[in-house]
Amino acid sequence: MEQFRNIGIIGRLGSSQVLDTVRRLKKFLLARHLHVILEDTIAEVLPGHGLQTSSRKLLGEVCDMVIVVGGDGSLLGAARALARHNIPVLGINRGSLGFLTDIRPDELEVKVAEVLDGHYLVENRFLLQAEVRRHAEAIGQGDALNDVVLHPGKSTRMIEFEIYIDGQFVCSQKADGLIVATPTGSTAYALSAGGPIMHPKLDAIVIVPMYPHTLSGRPIVVDGNSELKIVVSKDMQIYPQVSCDGQNHFTCAPGDTITVSKKAQKLRLIHPLDHNYYEVCRTKLGWGSRLGGGGD
């Protein structure tokens, strides 16, 4: 197992609970004589911290591991910035769900100590890369750990588009939009739209239409190495948008092409040894417990 000596900390802004947890984490890491580096945005709201700071973009170059304090959204943002550095990322949950940030604040010291002592699991989560092209020229690019979404923006009209997989025409659709999700994102927006839950170890991508104008419009699971192409109808009178993990919005014009494929770099997500994906799903999604009151 790797030795972590230089630890980066990213925290969600706007929460006093996050700041309290960051202070606890900082104190704990310094007590173990580790080098702690704060992301510059969280450092600005921690006066007198006395630590080295770094931009998120460069944090992956100076750290052995980065700990994210916040919710899943905070980790999504960190993943897009850190995946290219192949650096392990650990999440402490200060959000509402915690599919990705799975360490509770009350167990911070115990679980982080286990990880630092080499007792942890590593999951490699792949990201998607999206590109919007107009007349063969790229007008927007973005990465996503969860999903790439084509949606109508402020318009209430449906979008008409064609779907191609690996150069082969699949279908045309008229829908409120389209979600292209990773296994990580299968428990996010795609799940709300009726998509399947995919285990994070699967090498697959799910395509989920949003309120399609046909009963046969159903989610499709394809090979993770597939290249997807979505062509917006030239007859559209609205300008739909493409978003990556709810960020990096690009406005499309009729006739634009959106290409989505797997990104070469992956996120190295760290979990404590007792991490159980099905327990996380059962807890977060309200699945039933064992029959007969047997607990977990």
From Swiss-Prot:
PANTHER family: NAD KINASE. One of its GO terms (biological process) is NAD metabolic process. This is NAD kinase. It catalyses: NAD(+) + ATP = ADP + NADP(+) + H(+). The keyword Cytoplasm applies. Its EC number is 2.7.1.23. Involved in the regulation of the intracellular balance of NAD and NADP, and is a key enzyme in the biosynthesis of NADP. Catalyzes specifically the phosphorylation on 2'-hydroxyl of the adenosine moiety of NAD to yield NADP. It comes from the Bacteria. It is an enzyme of class 2 (transferase). Its main location: cytoplasm. Belongs to the NAD kinase family. NAD(+) binds at residues 72-73, 146-147, 157, 174, 176, 187-192, 247. The active site is at 72 (proton acceptor). It comes from Pseudomonas fluorescens (strain ATCC BAA-477 / NRRL B-23932 / Pf-5). One of its GO terms (cellular component) is cytoplasm. InterPro entries: ATP-NAD_kinase_N, ATP-NAD_kinase_PpnK-typ_C, NAD/diacylglycerol_kinase_sf, NADK. One of its GO terms (molecular function) is NAD+ kinase activity. Keywords: ATP-binding, Cytoplasm, Kinase, NAD, NADP, Nucleotide-binding, Transferase. Its cofactor is a divalent metal cation. It is found in: Cytoplasm.
